[in-house]
UniProtKB/Swiss-Prot annotation:
Cystines in this chain: C37-C53, C44-C58, C52-C68
UniProt-listed Pfam families: Toxin_7
Pro-peptide region(s): 21-34
Keyword vocabulary terms for this entry: Amidation, Disulfide bond, Knottin, Neurotoxin, Secreted, Signal, Toxin
Native organism: Agelena orientalis (Funnel-web spider)
Modified residue annotations for Leucine amide: L69
A molecular function (GO) term: toxin activity
UniProt keyword Endoplasmic reticulum, yes or no: no
Domain characteristics, as noted in the entry: The presence of a 'disulfide through disulfide knot' structurally defines this protein as a knottin.
Domain of life: Eukaryota
Record-given protein name: U2-agatoxin-Ao1b
Length: 70
C-alpha cells in the first residue's frame, strides 16, 4: 500500500514539474536556426545541413569538430 501511494505522489510531482515549463519556451529558436543557416563559430556539418550563413564556411577543426568560420 505504501509503495502505491509513493508511486502516485512521485508521478504527481513529476507531472507538476513538466507542466511548470511552458511548451513555447522550450521550442523557441533564433531566426538563423529556423532559417537553416548557422552564425559564426557554431557547430556545422560540411556534408549535410544546416549550412553556414553567407560569408562563412564550415571548416573542419578536428575529426569531431567543424565550425562556421570566415
Amino acid at each position: 500500500m505504501r509503495a502505491i501511494i509513493s508511486l502516485i505522489l512521485i508521478s504527481a510531482m513529476v507531472f507538476s514539474m513538466i507542466a511548470a515549463v511552458p511548451e513555447e519556451e522550450g521550442l523557441q529558436l533564433s531566426e538563423d536556426e529556423r532559417g537553416g543557416c548557422l552564425p559564426h563559430n557554431r557547430f556545422c556539418n560540411a556534408l549535410s545541413g544546416p549550412r553556414c550563413c553567407s560569408g562563412l564556411r564550415c571548416k573542419e577543426l578536428s575529426i569531431w569538430d567543424s565550425r562556421c568560420l570566415g
